[in-house]
Amino acid sequence: MAVIAFTQEMATLGSDVAQGVCEALGLEMVRHEVGDVVAGRMHVKKSLIRRLREGKAGPFEKWTADEKSISIFTAEEVLERAVKGNVLVRGWGATMILRSVSHVPCVRVCAPMDLRVTRLMKRLETDDEKLARHEIDVDDHARATRMSEHFGVHWGDPTLYDLTLNTERIPVATCVDMVVGLAKSAAFQETDASRRHLADLALRAHARAALKAN
């Protein structure tokens, strides 16, 4: 059962790549669903979790939010989804949470800043370059901060990923083919050992979440 951990920079066509991979492999795409579960476990509004993830929460929201709880419940949900299999998890630190599982390819999609700004301006139907660049900067900072605080790593470090795709040079369709090829390769086939390791990670995450909930 294929499992793919996927992350992307804003305005890189990463969502198109992820959708194409899911269609090609028959996978469920999981993104916002993780946040919905985390919000439920923490008894807070879904919008609060979303704003925190996007780096748009206000000072009071940041002060009241329990980042440790978010991290614990996120890991539990991501690992639970991975155990079920046939899933592509977008974001939520999945590339770090699942990195030690040998049958899970970790993929990152990126592109040069100027191209991302152009793409976002088109998406937002605006000619305000400053606005688009600010939105990207805020998103990049939020992602980088989460990865640093939760995992102690630099989000852009290429050694954290099995495959990094630059959509300035590689078309979406080719990106999809490359991810599908990686997932089907012998290097990323599930084994008894990798399945047991994933199950063990999930069990430990569930125990941590249960303790936190109580």
Task: Name each model-derived stretch.
Residues 4-21:
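Glycine-rich phosphate-binding P-loop
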Residues 91:
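Divalent-cation
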Residues 3-6, 59-64, 120, 162-164, ...:
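Short hinge/gating elements
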Residues 35-86, 126:
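ATP-dependent small-molecule kinase phosphotransfer cores
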Residues 181-204:
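N-terminal presequence-like segments and adjacent domain-start helices
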Residues 128-172, 202, 208-213:
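Small-molecule kinase domains that catalyze NTP-dependent phosphoryl transfer to phosphate-bearing small molecules
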Residues 100-123, 130-136:
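Conserved phosphate-donor/acceptor-positioning beta-strand/loop module used by diverse small-molecule
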